[in-house]
Design a protein with these regions (language model features):
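Acidic, surface-exposed loops and disordered segments
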Residues: 1-212
Length: 212
């Protein structure tokens, strides 16, 4: 599979891709790890020729995009961190209450609350760079006495979200390779145009476009 996968710049006009298999590969991509399991991403599977043409133009009409039969756009959604953190917290809390020994439930619940209700909001919140500077100062002070997370500027946390999204995209491309389908990841694109085409909210960011 790894030997087979290549970034393909031109796609066949006669051999049609199976959209259902692409959907299956996208389902498999959901198994990719993401930081704190927050899943701060969305995926848009584009199959309509008109929209594909618009996306291809926004990708500077690269041949891999203009000849693609389908396009998948990977989006980051850092703005949804509170909603996603709550979902992960609720799921894990239920697991603790069902399966943990009774004497350990309070301790494990407290750790879960500290992480998803305090630390995650502290790390992922944004306010014109101000909160990042505050986090950096806290990190430096804590770092004198114990190991601590240093990359806490708002730009650092944005990078974390994009890295997690990239893991999902890579898992998708490997799954496609397993189906003997070729893909091509594109980073050359007009992100604002793609956001407008897909009618994305302000907090969304285009992370990667994959032609297939």
């Amino acid at each position: 599979m790894l030997q087979h996968r290549r970034a393909v710049r031109s796609y066949s006009k006669t051999e049609r891709i199976d959209s259902e298999k692409v959907k299956e590969c996208l389902q498999l991509a959901q198994l990719a790890p993401t930081s704190s399991n927050l899943q701060l991403r969305e995926v848009y599977h584009i199959t309509t020729p008109k929209v594909i043409a618009q996306i291809a133009e926004a990708c500077f009409s690269q041949r891999s995009a203009t000849t693609a039969q389908e396009i998948v756009v990977f989006i980051t959604r850092q703005d949804l961190y509170r909603q996603r953190a709550k979902a992960v917290f609720d799921f894990n809390l239920e697991e603790i209450q069902k399966n943990a020994p009774k004497d350990r439930i309070p301790t494990r619940t407290k750790k879960l609350q500290d992480y998803y209700q305090k630390l995650i909001p502290f790390l992922y919140s944004r306010c014109f760079g101000i909160l990042g500077c505050f986090r950096k100062r806290v990190s430096r002070i804590k770092g004198f006495s114990k190991p601590t997370l240093r990359e806490v500027y708002e730009s650092d946390m944005r990078t974390v979200v994009h890295k997690s999204c990239a893991l999902v995209a890579q898992t998708f491309m490997l799954a496609m390779s397993e189906q003997n389908y070729d893909t091509c990841p594109l980073e050359g694109f007009d992100s604002q145009r793609i956001k407008k085409i897909l009618n994305l909210p302000q907090g969304a960011e285009v992370s990667l476009v994959v032609a297939c």
